Amino acid sequence: MFEISGKYGSAKVYANTVEDSAMAQIVELCNSPLAEGSNIRIMPDVHAGSGCVIGLTMTITDKVCPNLVGVDIGCGVESMYFEPPDGIDFEKLDRVIRENIPSGFAIYDKDTPFSVNLEDELSCGKRINLSRAYKSLGTLGGGNHFIEVNKSTKNENGYWLMVHSGSRNVGLQVETYYQNKARELCANKKGVSKALSYLEGKELDAYMFDMNIMQYYAYINRFRIAFRIMGWMGWSLIKSITTIHNYIDQDNNVLRKGSIAAYKGESLVIPLNMRDGSLICVGKGNEDWNFSAPHGAGRIMSRSEAKSNVSMEDYKEAMKGIYTTCVSESTLDESPMAYKDFSEIESIVGDTVDIVERVVPVYNFKAGN
């Protein structure tokens, strides 16, 4: 662990390796009024993001920058444990997903019922385009979003279905609306960058309210995907874990961007990469870590770097033994080699979580960009 100090605050960094661009973003945050009075902690999977660092957790005060939560509000992983009596038909699973779960930019042709009237309930509902919102519920998206089946290493009959997705296009629109509002409000404030412009007062209250709705939307989106797959495959749910990594925990005033809650006794999942699986963990409730843990292994290559530096031959070799029809040029930027070695994460997180087991992939679906 080392510490970075700035004009308004400091950040403790729980990482062995931090790229220069991520370091610059941490320094910028510590030089921002957002850092004043905040406990800032940087997780082991830290890497540079679009305008702000990923792997961030910080306590919030009377100022919040929507960009720190990001455009995929409420993104996370829904994990469902099951024990199929007759094994898994991977060809059927792949067909079921491809035929029924839109991915990439695809959405449904018809609206999906949702318990919240977004136009009426969202404070910004009449200022954004909601035409895609109801058609996007139950869709995966692209990038690092995935559907995966992981085998338990402790129970030979046990498997975890994992779905990583978020609030889709509607979350992006909500964040964009409020970040633009923040830029307007901070336009004349000296030393406040566009990326770290913030909301206060009634505008902050409106954002927090709408963000909460988006977190619920993201949860229902993941749950719908996972639960429908369980039904189509005839799998019985035994237990589940919900792990969110782009949100504000309003009960405890903790912002997490690319980090997850690790309260004492809380089960959580840390996905590593499409070859090495995920860590099933239990939180220790470490206050110095802001009761948080990393949300993954963290990238060591940008998407463009991965596409330039990783060969298809190496990608195919890395994925041997895992059923997938998604190893292609379009997903090369998500290859295992684009991420940090998971052993680095395992070696650091012992202060904040107990690792129950590492589950290993037997099936992976990931849409190309």
Segments from the language model and where they lie:
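A generic, well-ordered mixed alpha/beta core segment in the N-terminal half of proteins
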Residues: 66-123
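Domain-length cofactor-binding catalytic modules of enzymes
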Residues: 2-28, 35-42, 48-56, 62-66, ...
